[in-house]
Amino acid sequence: MKNKRENDYLIHRILEKIEGSSVDWRKEASGNRSLKIQQEDFNRAGKTELLEEARKLEQRGLIQIKWLEYGNDIEKITYRLEQAGQFYELLGLIPKWERLASEKEKIQTWSRKAQTGWLKAYYRNLEEALEKGKQPADLEKYGEPLFICLDALEKLKEPVYQRVFSVAVLGGTKVFENVLRTRVVSILSEYHPDVDEAMNDKEVLSQVYLEEYAQELAVKGNLRISLKGNEISLDRKSVV
């Protein structure tokens, strides 16, 4: 918004203040709030443009102006939280309460799929952040691919190579390694009950059966390998 001459400067400022509050962003919020007008606001919006916008908003019944010098200088404007939806409509934006409700619904969908305590706890913390009006960084930075990854990880029952997992679940051999690996390790370190501070990244991922090619895989049950036309049964150590 800096250095722009915008006819909707005041609306942006009002919504920034509303969304920056811990309570005013909620749909049921009510009461009057005020916004002091500084010289910086005139510099950014342009004095003529800001005064004109203020007059139009007052004519619509959306704000009240307290003048320092009538028609030339504004001390502050006052608005009602009950009318926040109208400010969003003027800009064609979705209200914060609707955006967060939509995000919460997505998280709840993934949470219902979760089978393990650690993953449920992770989703629960995301929900709590949204309820407080905070946008979790994981939603902005990683989004659905992270949740798809976590959902598949918690359901692994046997060891699998990271790149095999990545192509099967995320559609590319290096997506997990390049995009999600570091964050997944952090989540497991915080929430998984079998992970401790002494573990390195490889050991952490092993707790959910995700292995690197350099590591040895432990396989449950009988294993039969086809090699040059022969089948090798490792449980009996014989060629069949």
Language-model-detected regions and their locations in the chain:
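Nucleic-acid enzyme cleavage-core boundary/entry regions
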Residues: 1-240
